[in-house]
Amino acid sequence: MTWLAAESGDVMPHTGPAFRLRRKGTAAALTVIAAGALIAGVAGPAAAAPGDRGHHATRTLCSSGAYVGGTRYWVQDDRFGTDPRQCLRLTPHGRAAFTVSVSGAGNPGNTAEAFPYIQYGCYWGWCTPGSRLPLRVSALRSATSTWYTREHARGIWNAGFDLWLNSTRLARRHANRAEVMIWLNATTRHYRVRGPAGTREVTVAGRRFYLTHWRTGTATIRGGWEYVQYRLAGTPSRVRNLNLRAVLLDAARRHLISRSWYLQGVLAGNEIWRGGRGLATTRFSVTVTRRR
């Protein structure tokens, strides 16, 4: 979910931390690169074990992940750049929160170098214990999230939800149908977004969004996948009981996704191009119920 400058000068998404955009002349081509930190994070329980011994103390993650909120959520220090390390500080008592305490990001270009995130549900085939996901969109009775962020950080970064949809129940690797993003805030340079169909203002469950969408290239998944972005009006730093189900149903009504696809999980995090030290998630929760 990296923002990249397209040839037109607009900023477009680079979907998923396992990918990087490389340019050849004036043409842009997506190429899959190794995402060691991400794949290690998907291992989940094994990676978390050492850090879990200090559950009631302040913990620091550097290129690793850990459970928070008991085992309900997973925090991943995902860094896919090549510059100095990045570390996250976890709060005591296992709260669902983290702070970027060390950031070596310094990319002056258009590719983000890191995506520290918190996860509920499934991502790249690994699921947080006890999660109700994956579920078909049509099977969701409710899906809401509360996310509070702290954004007093210098540099170039953004903050958003990342919802992946797959044609089958569990995507063992990259989800193959759609990525629905809900953006809260970002630094100005990487906030200009316009898909081929333009941007429209929509209202979903009483909230105003700016909606844009397009289909990705085919270099990563056969046939590509749909990219749908809902950007919250007013660039808030926090949302309470955000209705994720309503956003997905709105996208389905517009024929951008299918109600038969499976929601894999809910991720929320910050992409960081430069700086970012001090960015924080101070509160996070997801509640999902299914239809009987």
Segments the model singles out, each with a brief description of its role:
Residues 162-164, 181-183, 210, 248-250, ...:
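Residues within well-ordered beta-strands of beta-sheet-rich folds
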Residues 168-243:
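Short helix-loop boundary/capping segments
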